[in-house]
């Protein structure tokens, strides 16, 4: 966790045009305070800041952002939006939530993975102990796909109509030559796409597959794809938590 936030904050400090952030929740703790202070400083420099969070994710976490936090952030130039605000009768949409975790900085650098904004990724939790999660930093053409994923949700919630071409990009830096697939699952639109991506990747594997998942509940089709890979001689490594924050 510490490495992710250190790299993220350093990249934010270098931002010149815009910073887009999307998380299931921003927990109101020491990490969020440091992040928002930094974002406010960048906004003061003229950098456009847009941040999106899931309303259910915010309300369900132990230290949610409250109206006074959002008002203060708006006054400091940090534009915040909620994904699918919880309204009565909430049962109709409570399960279609936004779990995307995306940061895009100037169209050059992107972050995605499993971490929200919270200091327990560094400090752990008393009831769980140390917390391990995965996050990746991306440069190169793949960042554009993270941008599209963010803008799709942002525009849906704000009706702003911001297009990728309206986002000021400098020339994208060249990639490393490694292949990266950005797969966006949208509830009610393409619910099967993530499973299909897993199966395609497993069926294409030649040497090794590494899976890290805190809630490993693969469907029958995914289990069969794992079995096929193993039967071909592919080494399959699966990491799951010894102790989970969710009982299932």
Across the structure, where does each feature detected by a protein language model lie?
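Charged, low-complexity intrinsically disordered terminal segments
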Residues: 1-248
